[in-house]
């Protein structure tokens, strides 16, 4: 159950980061303030909840194991950037993502 909490904390952290990115997207000048407040508010909510869940994880998992698992954020953000904003990702970047996943598997299997 705690590993599910860790994944959820990671996803909420990523959601907060993606909301920050969305806040920077261009909108009409008369809607800009509302747009920024909405997305930054959502970012704060996601990041705040992620922090609470992260504290629960740290109560149950050694920090040396739990912290590297947050590298999942790099994977989630890359996937979201491609899907949501159609950002290009180089083969070298995908190779790095594969190494991150490999590292997470290796570190996670030591528990």
Curated annotation (Swiss-Prot):
SUPFAM superfamilies for this protein: Multidrug resistance efflux transporter EmrE
GO cellular component labels: plasma membrane
Transmembrane portions of the chain: 36-56, 61-81, 88-108
Pathway annotation: Bacterial outer membrane biogenesis; lipopolysaccharide biosynthesis
Main location: membrane
Location in or out of the cell: Cell inner membrane
GO BP of this protein: lipid A biosynthetic process; lipopolysaccharide biosynthetic process
Quaternary assembly: Heterodimer of ArnE and ArnF.
Function text: Translocates 4-amino-4-deoxy-L-arabinose-phosphoundecaprenol (alpha-L-Ara4N-phosphoundecaprenol) from the cytoplasmic to the periplasmic side of the inner membrane.
PANTHER family associated with the record: 4-AMINO-4-DEOXY-L-ARABINOSE-PHOSPHOUNDECAPRENOL FLIPPASE SUBUNIT ARNE-RELATED (PTHR30561:SF23), SMR FAMILY PROTON-DEPENDENT DRUG EFFLUX TRANSPORTER SUGE (PTHR30561)
Family: Belongs to the ArnE family.
This protein's name: Probable 4-amino-4-deoxy-L-arabinose-phosphoundecaprenol flippase subunit ArnE
Organism: Shigella dysenteriae serotype 1 (strain Sd197)
């Amino acid at each position: 159950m705690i590993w599910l909490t860790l994944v959820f904390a990671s996803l909420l952290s990523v959601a907060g980061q993606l909301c920050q990115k969305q806040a920077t997207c261009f909108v009409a000048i008369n809607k800009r303030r509302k747009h920024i407040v909405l997305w930054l508010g959502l970012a704060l909510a996601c990041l705040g909840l992620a922090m609470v869940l992260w504290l629960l994880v740290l109560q149950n998992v050694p920090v040396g194991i739990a912290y590297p698992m947050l590298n999942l954020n790099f994977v989630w953000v890359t996937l979201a950037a491609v899907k949501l904003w159609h950002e290009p990702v180089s083969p070298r970047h995908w190779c790095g993502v594969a190494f991150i996943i490999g590292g997470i598997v290796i570190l996670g299997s030591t528990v």
